[in-house]
């Protein structure tokens, strides 16, 4: 049964976004020369990747970035949050722990990746001297609201009530309301408040056709996600996730960006930075994937479009803006 499958797969889920499995043989603090001589020329840009941890999506990103920079004559050093952070060149902070560590350092140029928009905005509040310049930026891990709204409207066109449960109102709440409204969707909002997450969720599900999950760790975490997925399944209200891990565990679908896609975007920004020594404003991922759990759809009696069709629809809308 799907319910048993959900229960069995929850242990595989890494929250908030990726499952970071440790990998044998992963060594940090390695210098990975990308120029033929293995040495940086005088005045040449150096790039240091600071990872929040070993393996998993952190290492996937770093490996993909190294490959994307091949033949670009840009040395790439890889280190961890417990090492000395360089005070020159460009530093790529991978994950929130690395972002916090690097923001507190003397690194002159910092690009943050695998961090959510809310996480990045928190960094700017905690380190205000980093704000308002071309020396500190990010590529968000989460997706633009428009992509999420398009996915919801396209995958379940006959359903219109979208439940949104949060601990504190998300910064883009007004934009969520607008994007949903443009597509004929009605947002059903509920703050957890003094209730427990299960109590608040159960009330919300009674008035929702689907549930939109956002990266809110006070609600969607290792302790609660199993019960949330089971509650949505029992109520026959599909969950719209925000990562591939959620879809594999029992969410109906998600739009997300893989570490490799973000790495390609970072490589492009590095090439620009090598010429201008300026970082662009923080931005959303350019490339993305859509994943659909067809088994969940069948179990809930839903007829949904393929992930390929859904992704194409979102891409077409992105291109028209």
For each feature predicted by the language model, list its residue ranges.
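N-terminal secretory signal peptides that target proteins for export/translocation
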Residues: 1-20
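Generic N-terminal simple sequence motifs
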Residues: 5, 12, 29-32, 153
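Bacterial N-terminal signal peptides
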Residues: 23-36
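Short hydrophobic alpha-helices and adjacent helix-cap/hinge residues
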Residues: 41-321
């Amino acid at each position: 049964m799907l319910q048993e499958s959900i229960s069995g797969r929850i242990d595989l889920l890494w929250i908030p976004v990726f499952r970071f499995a440790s990998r044998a043989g992963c060594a940090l603090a390695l210098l990975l020369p990308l120029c033929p001589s293995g040495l940086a020329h005088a005045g040449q840009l150096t790039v240091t990747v600071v990872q929040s941890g070993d393996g998993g999506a952190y290492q996937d990103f770093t490996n993909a970035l190294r490959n994307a920079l091949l033949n670009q004559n840009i040395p790439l050093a890889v280190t961890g949050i417990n090492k000395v952070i360089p005070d020159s060149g460009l530093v790529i902070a991978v994950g929130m722990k690395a972002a916090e560590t690097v923001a507190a350092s003397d690194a002159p140029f910092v690009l943050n990746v695998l961090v959510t928009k809310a996480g990045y905005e928190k960094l700017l509040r905690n380190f205000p001297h980093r704000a308002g310049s071309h020396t500190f930026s990010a590529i968000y891990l989460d997706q633009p609201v428009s992509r999420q709204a398009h996915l919801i409207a396209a995958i379940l066109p006959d359903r219109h009530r979208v439940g949104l449960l949060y601990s504190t109102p998300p910064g883009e709440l007004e934009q969520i309301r607008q994007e949903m409204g443009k597509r004929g969707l009605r947002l059903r909002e509920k703050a957890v408040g003094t209730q427990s997450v299960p109590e608040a969720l159960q009330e919300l599900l009674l008035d929702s056709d689907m549930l939109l999950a956002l990266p809110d760790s006070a609600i969607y975490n290792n302790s609660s996600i199993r019960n949330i997925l089971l509650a949505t399944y029992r109520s026959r209200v599909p969950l719209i996730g925000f990562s591939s891990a959620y879809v594999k565990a029992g969410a109906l679908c998600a739009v997300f960006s893989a570490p490799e896609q973000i790495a390609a975007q970072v490589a492009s920004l590095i090439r620009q930075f090598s010429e201008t020594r300026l970082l662009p404003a923080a931005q959303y991922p350019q490339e993305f994937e859509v994943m659909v759990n067809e088994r969940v759809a069948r179990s809930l009696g839903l007829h949904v479009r393929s992930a390929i069709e859904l992704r194409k629809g979102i891409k077409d809308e992105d291109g028209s803006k």
